[in-house]
């Protein structure tokens, strides 16, 4: 569904409306931090984000537009990641510590760390007593202590 008129995204909606047209906007974890500027939806419709500067776009967010009954749904993009696991909790904690010292973004799950696929990081991980494997999934890194999101 392409519209010729410019679509401007202006705010978050708390509940998904039962009626209306929806465009899907699939974004990586990095792209979900940028709240202003032009984007292309999944159906190649150009939209302009003009959201309040604070916050972050999350998977499943519904955004209002300057068109009545027209909405944008945020979808987290599947990304190439490294999945890190270990039978030893202490080894996993040490690995998280060293990755944190390198300011590497991490998603922390029960018994698993996830980070973006990176050749240098992958080689560094080979020196730790952890299991590593490539995976592709949605990435939700922890927000840092000094984050302004």
Curated annotation (Swiss-Prot):
Subcellular location as annotated: Cytoplasm
Pfam families: UreE_C (PF05194)
Chief place where the protein resides: cytoplasm
Disulfide bridge partners, by residue number: none
SMART domains (UniProt xref): UreE_N (SM00988)
GO CC, one annotated term: cytoplasm
Record keyword Cytoplasm present: yes
GO biological process, any: urea metabolic process
Keywords: Chaperone, Cytoplasm, Nickel, Nickel insertion
Listed GO MF terms: nickel cation binding; unfolded protein binding
Role description: Involved in urease metallocenter assembly. Binds nickel. Probably functions as a nickel donor during metallocenter assembly.
Family: Belongs to the UreE family.
Name of the protein: Urease accessory protein UreE
Organism: Prochlorococcus marinus (strain MIT 9301)
Gene (UniProt): ureE
